[in-house]
Amino acid sequence: YEKIDRCNMVIDAENDVACDNDEDRALLRHVMGECHYLRATYYFTLVNLYAKPYVPSTAESTPGVPVKTSSKVEDKEYTRASVAEVYRQILADLDAAETDLKDVKSPATIYHVGIDAVYIFRSRVEMFMQEWQKAADDAKRALDEDSYLQNLVGWKDGYPISSDNKEVVYSNGASCFGNIVFLAPGKKSNYDSP
């Protein structure tokens, strides 16, 4: 919720930012798009950690997590929104991110959100919601933006999930990939060049 609050602060301050030229306006759009995207990912993580899975027939009555979309300090007790309400907020944030990022130049690094990351993540959310056709449509939009494949044949060292891998469209931080991926003894040969 601390990270959500930071996103809320930036989103709430949008109208306080003076943009004197197109470059400033594009930067503001990018920042707003990233904040909406990040807030969606944080709520997605929370609802999937602390609530039951999304089931279309019960999502409206299944307790989710509290939703707060304002940075204002309020003296009140927040109650859990339904799983459906949380997912609606996630999709609303992703729609806002799409609006903000669709005409913005793609980021130069994987550490900033681009439109392809929005499509990929929305596709994932829609899969969790069992909205199969919508998920397929957003996945196709992402592939239409960028459809690179990394050839792992002959890969010998380094990390396949890195900033120079064309398949990675967004990375939120860093990971110690070598500590979480293991190959069974004798299986590395499955990835050697033919």
Place the predicted regions along the sequence by residue.
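Short coil/turn linking the two alpha-helices of tandem helical-hairpin repeats
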Residues: 47-54, 105-106, 128-131
